[in-house]
């Protein structure tokens, strides 16, 4: 629905501990974190292990598997989430970042099951140094 707006342009940051970038919810209403079915990331053509990535929303940060259990934590449409890639140290310059986000829309049944949608966005961004 909003695939070209999933990755926030110019949000790629990095330091010696890893990298991060921001994403937006590809839907028009807030959804619980438990509706995330998949979040996959590739940087410069190399897939990052989804079991290692972390997602930060509101004032919390979780591994993807933990976030998928968070029924009471809501991702609001106007709030960016930060995707952290621990250990992925990037050199200065431009990098190709791709994210695929699959969400389950619990209140829209299709053939007796909640609607499931997957959107992919790709951006070329210059890495910025992560500041405290």
Curated annotation (Swiss-Prot):
It catalyses: 3'-dehydrocarminate + H(+) = kermesate + 1,5-anhydro-D-erythro-hex-1-en-3-ulose. Pfam families: CGDB (PF19906). Its cofactor is Mg(2+). Keywords: Carbohydrate metabolism, Lyase, Magnesium. Transmembrane segments: none annotated. Its EC number is 4.1.99.28. The keyword Repressor does not apply. InterPro entries: CGDB (IPR045959). Optimum pH is 7.5. Activity is strongly reduced in the presence of chelating agents. It comes from the Bacteria. GO terms for molecular function: lyase activity. Optimum temperature is around 40 degrees Celsius. Carbon-carbon bond-cleaving enzyme which participates in a carminate degradation pathway. Cleaves the C-C bond in 3'-dehydrocarminate to form kermesate. Also shows weak activity with other C-glycosides, such as 3''-dehydropuerarin (3''-oxo-puerarin), 3''-dehydroisoorientin (3''-oxo-homoorientin) and 3'-dehydromangiferin (3'-oxo-mangiferin). Belongs to the C-glycoside deglycosidase beta subunit family. Heterodimer composed of an alpha subunit (CarB) and a beta subunit (CarC). This is 3'-dehydrocarminate deglycosidase beta subunit.
